A protein has these predicted regions:
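Nucleotidyltransferase catalytic core that binds NTPs
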Residues: 1-145
């Protein structure tokens, strides 16, 4: 697909979900790459019953907005407590973007992608940049304490 500005685009609207507790350089790297592939990106600050974030999705969304460069004008941030697929349907997104740092992440993401595909939403898996792959949110929280 070609965007009106003549740039190559994979699609119109994609969603990049995560807990982002906190946002890491790896997350920002995924957003940076994805924003060039789609006309619009929504970074979806979500809940995850397996994780206990330090703040609410709304609080993390506010913090994440502050971290994004001002010129990333095709990137928006939203907080969401439901299923990512439901958000995609409600907001007209047809692709979910996910990042993977290692083999374990890829295995987990392939399972999620299969479920999303069965529900009609495509997943685009972007590998982490090698220099950022070790910097998880867990590591970032440890560095902050």
């Amino acid at each position: 697909m070609v965007h009106a500005g003549g740039e190559f685009r994979l699609g119109e609207h994609a969603v990049y979900p995560g807990t982002f507790d906190p946002i890491t350089p790896g997350h920002l790297g995924i957003i940076e790459r994805a924003r060039h592939l789609f006309a619009r990106i929504t970074v979806l600050v979500a809940t995850n019953s397996d994780k206990q974030p330090a703040s609410t999705p709304s609080g993390r969304a506010i913090q994440l907005r502050r971290e994004l460069p001002a010129d990333w004008d095709n990137v928006s941030v939203a907080a969401w407590a439901g299923l990512t697929v439901a958000f995609c349907r409600q907001h007209g997104a047809d692709v979910i973007i996910r990042g993977a740092r290692n083999r374990s992440d890829r295995r987990h993401e392939y399972q999620l992608a299969a479920m999303n595909e069965a529900l009609g939403i495509t997943t685009l898996l972007l590998p982490a940049q090698p220099e950022l792959a070790a910097m998880s949110s867990t590591v970032m929280r440890g560095l902050g304490s």
